[in-house]
């Protein structure tokens, strides 16, 4: 199942409530403010802070 980009209009980072960006290659939602990457599993974003990976500097 593919990620529906329309979700970007309604989802937010659970930490800072900021905008998320879709990284198609890595299948992640990125929060640039918190430098976190949230996984997308089977088209479903996993917006849990403990599942996020820190972005490389």
From Swiss-Prot:
A GO cellular component entry from the record: cytosol
Protein family according to the UniProt entry: Belongs to the UPF0434 family.
Protein name (record): UPF0434 protein Spea_1772
